[in-house]
Amino acid sequence: MSQDRRDVVRGLPLYKQGASHGENAVKLSSNENPFEPLPSVVEAVTRTLPRFNRYPLMSAEEVRSTIAGHFGVDVSQVAVGAGSTEVASQLMHALAGAGDEIIFPWRSFEAYPILTKVAGATPIPVPLTVDLRHDLDAMADAITDRTRVIFLCTPNNPTGTVLHTDEVVEFLARVPENVVVVMDEAYCHFNRDDAAVDGLTLLEDHPNVVVLRTFSKAYGLAGLRIGFAISTPEISDDLRRVATPFTVTTLAQQAAIASLAAEDELNERVNRIVAERTRVFDELTRQGWKIVPSQANFLWLATGDDTDRIDEVMVSHGVFARCWSEEGIRLSIGLDAENDRAIEALSQAVKG
């Protein structure tokens, strides 16, 4: 590795994991599913335990076939990785390199600029609009002959705002066919906006679209690490070529298969989280907090210069959210009692 390359790596910010301290701490910082794994998923993992002396199948054929059947696509269109973040990294390495550019909204998923630089490409962040949505016109204007990939995050992390089908279709009309548009839909299960885009509906007419999803959020498999992309067979094949071997464990593959078979139970839990999201939003709005309506399993509090003080108050009450100094606080939706503690902590912060 050259000295210049080492300097780039050493200059990368470390990804900041959501904080949690102490036995009685309430961790609302990582957008995790607060419910324990479904019994059928635990059973599937348990059955797999005696076999983890063997490597997982690199082809991941069974889980890819199950995903394909669930979403009505061909298995050749599905690629998997150890979480959607790894699949995003695969996309960048497969499609971009030195001298290339990757466009994404900002603020958005904080791994985007890190992964872009690791791939050797140049990050092109495009600021959100004043209402914290993607500025699609500005993103289209940012396209150059060096653009290789564009990320759209819907619902957006950390603001919870969504893109609508009509505006995405208009945006795609401005994107060259050789530029890949990644629809990062990690939080799509929590969306209740009928106008919101579903990336899967775009694939037939837009072969440069890739849909990125995960089992970490709604499915509750964050600790097992499995995500997937659905795209053209050609792009999926490229992803498998650059993937690190054996990263998607046998346990993760079987848990994902079992999760897709438990859709009714999954939806019941998601509906409970969405109901709590509405309750917490209403309570905090009554307290006077400035919150954008969210279609994810978290809320964004625009706290600006007061962010660090509010965070200190929350931590003093044992409540840990994800904070960005001078910008805002992302509060994950947890169990009812956990949300009650967050509401109480924030009521004390607003008094301060």
Swiss-Prot record:
<protein>
    <recommendedName>
        <fullName>Aromatic amino acid aminotransferase</fullName>
        <ecNumber>2.6.1.57</ecNumber>
    </recommendedName>
</protein>
<dbReference type="InterPro" id="IPR001917">
    <property type="entry name" value="Aminotrans_II_pyridoxalP_BS"/>
</dbReference>
<comment type="subunit">
    <text>Homodimer.</text>
</comment>
<keyword id="KW-0663">Pyridoxal phosphate</keyword>
<dbReference type="InterPro" id="IPR015422">
    <property type="entry name" value="PyrdxlP-dep_Trfase_small"/>
</dbReference>
<dbReference type="GO" id="GO:0000105">
    <property type="term" value="P:L-histidine biosynthetic process"/>
</dbReference>
<dbReference type="InterPro" id="IPR015424">
    <property type="entry name" value="PyrdxlP-dep_Trfase"/>
</dbReference>
<dbReference type="GO" id="GO:0004400">
    <property type="term" value="F:histidinol-phosphate transaminase activity"/>
</dbReference>
<dbReference type="InterPro" id="IPR015421">
    <property type="entry name" value="PyrdxlP-dep_Trfase_major"/>
</dbReference>
<feature type="modified residue" description="N6-(pyridoxal phosphate)lysine">
    <location>
        <position position="217"/>
    </location>
</feature>
<dbReference type="Pfam" id="PF00155">
    <property type="entry name" value="Aminotran_1_2"/>
</dbReference>
<dbReference type="InterPro" id="IPR050106">
    <property type="entry name" value="HistidinolP_aminotransfase"/>
</dbReference>
<keyword id="KW-0808">Transferase</keyword>
<dbReference type="InterPro" id="IPR004839">
    <property type="entry name" value="Aminotransferase_I/II_large"/>
</dbReference>
<dbReference type="InterPro" id="IPR024892">
    <property type="entry name" value="ArAT"/>
</dbReference>
<comment type="function">
    <text>Aminotransferase that catalyzes the conversion of aromatic amino acids and 2-oxoglutarate into corresponding aromatic oxo acids and L-glutamate.</text>
</comment>
<dbReference type="GO" id="GO:0008793">
    <property type="term" value="F:aromatic-amino-acid transaminase activity"/>
</dbReference>
<dbReference type="InterPro" id="IPR005861">
    <property type="entry name" value="HisP_aminotrans"/>
</dbReference>
<comment type="similarity">
    <text>Belongs to the class-II pyridoxal-phosphate-dependent aminotransferase family.</text>
</comment>
<keyword id="KW-0032">Aminotransferase</keyword>
<dbReference type="GO" id="GO:0030170">
    <property type="term" value="F:pyridoxal phosphate binding"/>
</dbReference>
